[in-house]
């Protein structure tokens, strides 16, 4: 095994060492169980064996995914994988690969790429947004199996599934997926209907009018490793390596004896196992430092302030949307941080994984306000909510003790709907829900502070237009629920509406 290129990312050297160690053991003494290794091959205690234990399996259907096979490990899963097969569908080779990941503690959702592709291309849309389907599936499966907390999914893909895995990492908002591990990635992608660009995916019409040619983007935002056979004739390693060399944080691992079919596990299974475990470890290490002991029960993220000419006297608490701390939440936090405002993010996906109440949310918000006023040395707080976080925020504000309410410079809601949910249900991932308490009466109760309601011109279910403009600051911006990605403007609108600060 040789790492052709490992591009600038702090976790890659450790991964390279780990994978090199695995490759050094890929010899006749590797000890893979039949039928993949010699029946007389001695075992190696240091080499991850091919999975031969029976994994628990179940079938379920959700959205585009019918009769989906899900593999579960013994005990609580350490990671969650969305595994995209090759064009041949979910066959014995894909099954063996999935079971090896289950042996590493992963829960694996087996996605038959041929069926998924046909389902996508049957839609009438001009281009395909599939990242939401996969994220939704991850939510649904983990809730269905009562995972104790939500695990950000890793994408694993083979051949065309590898191209899809890269495409989803590029299309989705940052941190929707933890990482991608691919086998036999090829930039030429056999799709009759193109994918939508999303957060950064780029492509051109395929050579000869066949499919699309994926184009490298400079930074995926999350790591990607491709295992590639040097004997691959379908997509030579050089072409894949040239593509991956242009993507920051990506790496390609060269496998000297492997073809595009990955038929001989002896030549790639150790690297596959070690690479997967390295990505899982990287994901765990990349998580922010744990919150202080007094807040250790809350899924919070700290975003420190960047140096500013005139530091603000406020900090911000952002309650994320139901997708968790990703995309718009992170970008608004970064925009505020750049203006000298530290941010504390509450990950709604993980917070509401178990049932909450308005009074409980208020108590937790009060704890955060009191702790971080002292920790950051600030006088006031901006309370900000997006989507689900916006829906629940007024319930917290109205139940705060007066000592904390007096510190609020602004309550800002973005993409607010008409009902609030304080717990995730399986139905939440099937359709929009009108259950839960109404948000209009609750936001109407807020007094004694400015309240900003931001909505997108293309949103048709926003509560903001129903608010009294004499009492509330109502701002309509271009775009839909994600405001066309203009997060710097969101930060500007928030600070402009707040009681005077030194940040603007």
Residues covered by each model-derived region:
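Conserved alpha/beta-hydrolase
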Residues: 102-120, 336-353
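Alpha/beta-hydrolase active-site loop
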Residues: 124-147, 355-376, 395
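C-terminal catalytic histidine-bearing segment of alpha/beta-hydrolase fold enzymes
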Residues: 250-301, 472-504
């Amino acid at each position: 095994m040789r790492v052709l290129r490992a591009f600038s990312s702090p976790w890659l050297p450790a991964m390279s060492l780990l994978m090199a160690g695995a490759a050094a053991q890929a010899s006749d003494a590797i000890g893979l169980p039949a039928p993949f290794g010699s029946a007389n091959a001695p075992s190696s205690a240091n080499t991850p064996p091919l999975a031969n234990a029976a994994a628990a399996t179940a079938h379920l259907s959700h959205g585009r995914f019918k009769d989906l096979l899900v593999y579960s490990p013994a005990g609580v899963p350490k990671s969650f994988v969305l595994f995209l097969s090759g064009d041949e569908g979910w066959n014995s080779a894909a099954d063996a690969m999935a079971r090896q990941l289950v042996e590493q503690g992963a829960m694996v959702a087996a996605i038959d790429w041929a069926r998924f592709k046909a389902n996508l291309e049957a839609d009438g849309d001009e281009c395909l947004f599939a990242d939401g389907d996969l994220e939704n599936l991850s939510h649904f499966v983990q809730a269905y199996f009562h995972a104790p907390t939500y695990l950000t999914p890793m994408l694993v893909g083979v051949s065309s599934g590898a191209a899809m895995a890269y495409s989803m990492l590029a299309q989705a908002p940052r941190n929707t997926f933890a990482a991608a591990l691919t086998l036999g990635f090829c930039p030429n992608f056999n799709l009759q209907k193109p994918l939508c660009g999303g957060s950064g995916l780029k492509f051109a019409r395929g050579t000869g009018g066949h499919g699309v040619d994926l184009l490298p983007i400079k930074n995926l935002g999350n790591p990607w490793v491709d295992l590639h056979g040097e004997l691959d004739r379908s997509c030579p390693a050089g072409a894949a390596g040239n593509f991956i060399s242009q993507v920051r944080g990506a790496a390609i691992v060269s496998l000297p004896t492997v073809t595009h079919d990955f038929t001989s596990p002896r030549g790639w299974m150790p690297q596959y196992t070690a690479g997967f475990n390295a990505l899982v470890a990287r994901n765990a290490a990349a998580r922010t430092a744990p919150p202080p002991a007094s807040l250790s029960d809350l899924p919070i993220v700290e975003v420190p302030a960047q140096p500013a000419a005139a530091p603000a006297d406020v900090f911000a608490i952002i309650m994320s949307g139901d997708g968790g701390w990703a995309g718009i939440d992170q970008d608004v936090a970064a925009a505020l941080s750049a203006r000298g405002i530290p941010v504390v993010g509450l990950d709604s996906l993980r917070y509401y994984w178990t049932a909450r109440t308005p009074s409980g949310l208020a108590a937790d918000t009060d704890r955060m306000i009191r702790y971080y006023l002292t920790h950051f040395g600030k006088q006031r707080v901006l309370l900000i909510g997006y989507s689900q976080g916006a829906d629940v925020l007024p319930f917290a504000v109205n139940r705060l003790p007066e000592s904390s309410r007096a510190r609020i410079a602004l309550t800002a809601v973005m993409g607010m709907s008409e009902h609030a949910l304080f717990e995730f249900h399986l139905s939440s991932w099937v359709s929009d829900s009108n259950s839960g308490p109404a948000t209009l009466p609750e936001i109407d109760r807020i007094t004694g502070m400015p309240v900003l309601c931001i909505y997108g011109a293309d949103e048709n279910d926003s509560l903001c237009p129903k608010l009294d403009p004499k009492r509330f600051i109502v701002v309509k911006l271009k775009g839909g629920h994600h405001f066309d990605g203009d997060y710097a403007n969101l930060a500007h609108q928030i600070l402009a509406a707040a009681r005077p600060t030194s940040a603007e």
